């Protein structure tokens, strides 16, 4: 996984942002 992150940092960053956004969305909908 670390090798893929080094070779494609933009892909890893995008996946991280999407994962974080999904977690926040689920938490937000869960609180509501």
Curated annotation (Swiss-Prot):
Catalytic residues of the enzyme: 5
Enzyme Commission number(s) of this protein: 3.4.21.-
GO biological process: proteolysis
Activity regulation, per record: Inhibited by PMSF. Not inhibited by benzamidine, aprotinin, SBTI, EDTA, EGTA, 2-mercaptoethanol, iodoacetic acid or pepstatin A.
UniProt temperature dependence: Optimum temperature is 60 degrees Celsius. Active from 30 to 70 degrees Celsius.
Keywords: Fibrinogenolytic toxin, Fibrinolytic toxin, Hemostasis impairing toxin, Hydrolase, Protease, Serine protease, Toxin
Keyword Coiled coil appears in the UniProt entry: no
Influence of pH: Optimum pH is 10. Active from pH 7 to 11.
GO molecular function, one term: serine-type endopeptidase activity
InterPro entries: Peptidase_S8/S53_dom_sf, Peptidase_S8_Ser-AS
Principal EC category: hydrolase
Record flagged with keyword Hydrolase: yes
Residues annotated as domain Peptidase S8: 1-32
SUPFAM superfamilies with a match to the protein in the record: Subtilisin-like
Ranges in coiled-coil conformation: none
Function summary: Serine protease. Has fibrinolytic and fibrinogenolytic but no plasminogenolytic activity. Cleaves after Arg and Lys residues. Cleaves fibrinogen alpha chain, beta chain and gamma chain in that order.
Family classification: Belongs to the peptidase S8 family.
Additional detail: On the 2D-gel the determined pI of this protein is: 4.55, its MW is: 31 kDa.
Protein name in UniProt: Fibrinolytic enzyme 2
Classification lineage: Eukaryota, Metazoa, Spiralia, Lophotrochozoa, Annelida
């Amino acid at each position: 996984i670390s090798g893929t992150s080094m070779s494609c940092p933009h892909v890893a960053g995008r996946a991280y942002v999407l994962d974080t956004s999904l977690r926040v969305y689920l938490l937000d909908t869960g609180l509501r």
